[in-house]
Amino acid sequence: MRMKKSLHRRDFLKQTALATASAALPVSPFASFAQTQQGQTPAAGQRAAAVPPHPPTKPRPHFPTADPAWAVTWDAALAVLAGNVRTLPRYDHPVLVEGSTYAGIWQECAPQEGLVYGTLQKYVAPQPGEPTPLQVARANHMAFFAQQKPDGQLPASIKLADKVGTDAGYGQIQMVVPIAATVWDLFLLTHDQELLETAYAACSRWDAWLRQYRDTRKTGLVEGFCTYDTGMDYSPRWKGIPNRCPDADARKCPPDPTMPRLCPDLSATVYGGRIALAAMARALGKYSEESRWLADAEHIRHLILTKLYSPEDAAFYDLDAQNNFVRVRSVVTIRILGEHVLDPIKDKAIFDAVWTKQVHNPEAFWAPFPFPSSALNEPTFVRPIPRNSWGGASQALTALRAPRWMPHYGKRAELTHLMQQWCAAIMRHAEFRQQMDPLTGEFTQPDPGGYSPAALVFLDFARRLSRA
């Protein structure tokens, strides 16, 4: 994600207070296992957890061990999220903002974050006059639909700094997890008919906008015009390409002979969105439209596999305007799996190659703290790791998305390992920061804490591990 204006100082101080050290906690075998593998024992101060503002009045999961760090970190994560529920000038209902330096919501992640928060509702004590997590989840979708332009474009972001009537937030498409997919999942939880009907109309128009303005080469795939389209700031994938679209207009491609690019992850987002639109159409009794969405989804899926996959590398790459692969092995390949582009049966050979050579390869993406944003053995891996870097750091956003695809491909044991690693790292450093070193699990310190995705990673993973 792109660096944004910091939260108001009062809110930053509130979040900082949540991260102050509590009494030293004993180091459990679970919380320290990742470090003892490297012969290191974390200091008690490094594992200091936040103190919740009020005693919890809702049940907690049955945590994997008796280590009190679980409960303390759990309460601290809930407090971070409560502090990040804000009202935007351009939308009347409170939303869950990104937190840390990101004072707003982004289409690539906010809908999923709202959804995950909604699934935690039974653990969140209701507060008078405050929205429930499911109400926040609804707002994290409806805010984007409310700001949709007449031509169908959805905003990439809506920020606390945006004034009413501003045209900000439309300078890139910045999508990863399809908003259509998360809104469908939310509908399955709430059976909110108004949400379903609004989402179906809005997401259909968004798909049409992308067809019109992001398929200039008429390939049927989705084109990337700038770095921020994919939210992969400072990734070598986009070296030499402008961060923003010209004139902050997502319809305009920069005048570069290698642009626009055919992007596998953006195309996968559209694929996942069309699958969700088909489900919505069926729920609305629009059976002919369901068939059309499924056919369109299969069409773009086929194009991703035939045009953007490199069998020799077992990786997915951008294809530039000169029909050359941009051979940077990035988290793009994992994003393809995130939308289930590979059929577990029909595409088993491709999946097995991708899994073995890239995703589960300890020299590539299966780092001690998965998943790095670039393969460990990728020559362009960026070190030392700067803040907000998709050039190598393991990002909380990528971790939060893992449960969307790993069980689908039968990788539950590996998901459990990933969740254990992330929970252990977060309990050591309970500031809830954006990213960490994939080799050590050390969070990037220049990133301020209070980052909603990191808090959600801990809460969602702790809950899932309690069922294991």
Which residues does each PLM region occupy?
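C-terminal segment of N-terminal export signals and the immediately downstream linker at the start
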Residues: 6, 27-66
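Aromatic-rich carbohydrate-recognition surfaces in CAZymes
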Residues: 103-232, 264-267, 271, 393-406, ...
